[in-house]
């Protein structure tokens, strides 16, 4: 894939939306971070149905897809275990998601989701839990499971 007119924004949500869609962030409703969304065109933080994500394109072409870590492209009213899950990573082409949905989280007691299910952390900070190694471990596990279960299928995470 080649981006020939890509630019980063001063904010994470717009940059991520542009990177995942190949479009200008305002064109797909991400002119600001999700917490700053409003009804103005280009600022809704609602991924339009006509904007296909790179994950969807890859999945349609035989790739397995997963996202790990910070997402921050789900409207704030959807960020809860009850959903709706219309704008979560698993609704935008990613077959698997392990990470957090907000702008930031703590390294020691993060609010994580596996797909759309809240995650109970395997240990406390006092027992040595840290977010970054946990994300790496889950990404590695996904790659190894993918390789073992579908060795002929391509994967992207």
Q: Model segments located where?
A:
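Formylglycine-dependent sulfatase
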Residues: 1-157
């Amino acid at each position: 894939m080649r981006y020939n007119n890509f630019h980063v924004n001063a904010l994470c949500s717009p940059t991520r939306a542009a990177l995942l869609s190949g479009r200008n962030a305002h064109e797909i409703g991400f002119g600001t971070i999700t917490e700053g969304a409003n009804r103005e065109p280009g600022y809704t933080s609602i991924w339009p149905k006509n904007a296909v994500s790179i994950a969807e394109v890859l999945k349609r072409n035989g790739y397995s897809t997963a996202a790990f870590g910070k997402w921050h492209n789900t409207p704030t009213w959807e960020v809860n275990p009850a959903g709706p899950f219309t704008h979560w990573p698993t609704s935008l082409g990613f077959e698997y998601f392990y990470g957090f949905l907000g702008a930031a989280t703590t390294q020691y007691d993060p609010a994580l989701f596996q797909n759309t299910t809240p995650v109970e952390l395997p240990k406390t900070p006092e027992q040595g839990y840290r977010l970054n190694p946990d994300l790496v471990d889950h990404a590695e596990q996904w790659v190894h499971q993918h390789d073992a279960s579908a060795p002929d299928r391509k994967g992207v995470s």
